Regions:
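Hydrophobic h-region of N-terminal signal peptides that target proteins for export
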Residues: 7-16
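Positively charged n-region of N-terminal signal peptides that target proteins for export
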Residues: 1-4
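Non-catalytic cap/lid and distal C-terminal segments of serine-dependent acyl enzymes
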Residues: 16-321
Length: 321
């Protein structure tokens, strides 16, 4: 009887515990605003992959209203593109770019939303199914090798350069993602810093799915690279408790994100981080996506005219060391 009562109260306590994700809500910079020009999302488009023979990648292009082909734009790529561009999702990156570009808090940029690769027989990832069990996502995103960087730099970028006026300056190229898409973004910049130097990571899977927990040690042992990183994670992310109840720190998302942050800090990287109470997903990362973008793209000069009604951040451009 005592055991039954204890079990009942434990279940009742869990049922009444607040959902930590419920604290995170999208703010005005993540929602359409009156008077803010809307960019256009074009696509879907497809490219065959040589890095992963037999697969192809689907992607969409965000073109801001302020885009001028005579002026090279910056570039921001989002892995798991379908999730980041979902108009009812937790990130709504196209709205964020609309608002921040209009406010001149980030530069005019082309956005690319790219999905994991898959074979013709496999389904396209969706907001409900990101493709972990149905596409090439685990191999592409979680592997610490140069194949996915080749997809982005050698397969996707030439097509984007052909169709749009984009700066060749790697300081003006960013890439981001969530979960496995976040570690994939880090891998692209780590392997190809001459092409990408800004990384946005939401609940990054820097864990032992395919050796990702090694990144903290790799960072410490490697020469410093010219990349800027913003990490976000939460204390209620997957915490490394195996099915048998044993704890495995190499599978603890929050622990490994903190380890990576410390390693980057010790090496003198331009790194920022935000730790919250969120579970695994985009809830907190989506809510703070505007701030993450502002910080990553804080290099450009902005207006200091007090009569400028659009500009709202009176900062000077970041000085290069």
């Amino acid at each position: 009887m005592k055991r039954s009562l204890a079990f009942f109260f434990a279940v009742a306590a869990l049922a009444q515990a607040p959902n930590p994700d419920a604290f995170y809500k999208l703010g005005p910079d993540s929602l359409p605003q009156d008077g803010v020009p809307k960019g256009e999302i074009r696509g879907p488009f497809k490219i065959d992959s040589k890095a992963y023979p037999g697969t192809f990648h689907t992607y969409w292009i965000y073109v801001p209203a302020q885009y001028d082909a005579s002026i090279p734009a910056s570039l921001m790529i989002f892995n798991d593109g379908q999730a980041f561009m979902n108009p009812n999702g937790d990130a709504r990156a196209q709205n964020v770019m609309d608002n921040l570009i209009y406010r001149r808090e980030i530069p005019v940029m082309i956005g690319v939303f790219i999905n994991p690769g898959h074979t013709p027989e496999q389904p396209e990832p969706t907001p409900a199914e990101w493709g972990d069990r149905t596409t090439n996502r685990p191999t592409e995103y979680n592997s610490l090798d140069d194949r996915y960087p080749r997809v982005i730099v050698d397969e996707l970028m030439p097509v984007i350069y052909k169709d749009y006026s984009i700066s060749k300056d790697p300081e003006r190229h960013g890439i981001g993602g969530a979960s496995s898409g976040a570690i994939a973004a880090f891998t692209v910049a780590w392997e190809r810093p001459d092409d990408f130097r800004k990384v946005l990571s939401i609940v990054g899977s820097f864990v032992n799915l395919r050796g990702g927990h090694a990144y903290a040690d790799i960072v410490r042992k490697s020469d410093k690279k010219p990349i800027r990183v913003y990490l976000q994670d939460g204390r209620n992310d997957n915490r490394g408790v195996r099915g048998d109840g044993n704890y495995d720190e190499t599978r603890d998302w929050f622990f490994q994100n903190v380890r990576l942050m410390k390693a980057l800090t010790e090496k003198g990287y331009d790194v920022n981080y935000a730790w919250g109470m969120n579970k695994h997903g985009q809830k907190m990362g989506g809510a703070i996506l505007p701030d993450m973008m502002r910080w990553l793209w804080r290099d450009q000069p902005v207006s200091t005219d007090p009569k400028d009604a659009a500009e709202r951040s009176f900062r000077e451009p970041v000085k290069k060391n």
